[in-house]
Amino acid sequence: MAFCIYVCFLLCYIVQVLTKAEGENHMTSAQIIIVVTIVLYLAAMVFVGVYFGKKGSGSSSDDFYLGGRKMGPVVTAMSAEASDMSSYLLMGLPGLAYLCGLPEVTWTAIGLAIGTYLNWLIVARRLRRYSAKLGAITIPDFFARRFGDKKHLLSCIAAVVILIFFIPYTASGFKAIGTLFNSLFGVEYHTAMIVGGIVVVLYTVMGGFMAVSFTDLIQSIFMTIALIVIVCFGVQQAGGLDTVIDNASALPGYLNMTQGYDAATGTASTYSALSIVSTLAWGLGYFGMPHIVLRFMAIREEKELNQSRRIATIWVVISMFIAVCIGVIGYSVSAAGKVPFLTTSAESETIIIKLADLMSRHGVLLAVMAGIILSGILAATMSTADSQLLAAASSVSQDLMQHSFGMKMNQRTTMLAARATVIGIALIGMVLAWDPNSSVFRVVSFAWAGFGAAFGPVMLFSLFWKRANKQGALAGMITGGAVVFIWKYLIAPMGGAWAIYELLPAFLAACIAIVIVSLATPAPEKAVTDTFDEICGK
């Protein structure tokens, strides 16, 4: 099966290249090297899926969704952060920095770094302990068991929220795959997107959580190599670090943390304190990301979370710093005439692809490195898409079909339902990603807000407030998700102080809803509060 996929991939690529415009009728040696490197990388990913599938990692629901809670600290840390740092790490962040300068992208990165650390510090330990005690293997299942929701209304709503926001999130990943091959080789966008999606689905359905987590570890290594190599090459091509700084300084507001550069007008724009708070609010999203917090539940030993936290935080800080630098460096490479100026959001998000293409023209070794860099972009996309597909599959087969709808399924039927869900959501994601001009950063931003507001407050209150009840949790979840849509499409367009990132007001509204509704309704049952005291202390 894997061999057939790679043959199809190469055939699609060759057909597209050979039917391109005149003057580009043959693959160059550099392009062949890059394709071989990427195909070997994809082969390695499928091999991991086959390996863990044969080991039985996808044979039971507990193994398929949570790896049997056997994850070591390094794999847990890197899997969590690789699944977090989707295509926006190697496309969204550099693209925004290239186009608009430091303010928005840097404050966003700072918020994400703080959010990462706090998530590991205050959520990880209690969630690992609590979920193990309750026997929960998904986030919706944890909410239902934590609040004693025997009717599983909470898990049903949570599963619907996951589907609503994961589908566009996954679509942004498939869009990145299509953009990669279209920008570099001229491969038809939709063909590349479909083939890349097939590979992601293949190793996800075969190996489950363990395959996803170990491929995430491998992919985080590729992402790191890509970032380091491209920043060094970019500085050299731009004419040195001094040239990079001079070029950036010449643009009004480009390096100013309280202004910003308006690429459309070539002038500085104000970046207010409200805007800074708004972008820092990205960090709030971590508390509600199902595909990230699931890693906390899967670690082998609770005591190993401290090591995981240190590894994860260091990697996130370094990788985002380099990603922002690449955007700034990329502008100077354009100024030097080495790559074209990129004037739109969709174009600027291809800056790393353009730099890798430039690198591939400087000999065999650098062509191989370019292939590794482009594999890193695939890694950033695939490491998030696979985790999201797995989380969505668990929501449908476990939380909706079995818990909410009461369907009785044996182990084999459960696994078939999970794998069918992975395929179905991937197909819907590809349909939504059909437009090649959509922005990765903006799509991820909206989905991030949805999860952060709908799940983040509920997660925090479930772990730290004994009085929170199922009515309050339900109110918070619905309020958070609804306010994201309302603020994004009705309030933010009013401009001014209203044009803040929708996650912040939605998160606050959800917190208020949880407190008010919990206090206005009966206290949780004694069994629920006794479990809370046992796990979290009185």
Where are the model-predicted features located?
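Membrane-embedded helix-loop-helix hairpins and adjacent transmembrane boundary segments
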Residues: 13-16, 23, 27-538
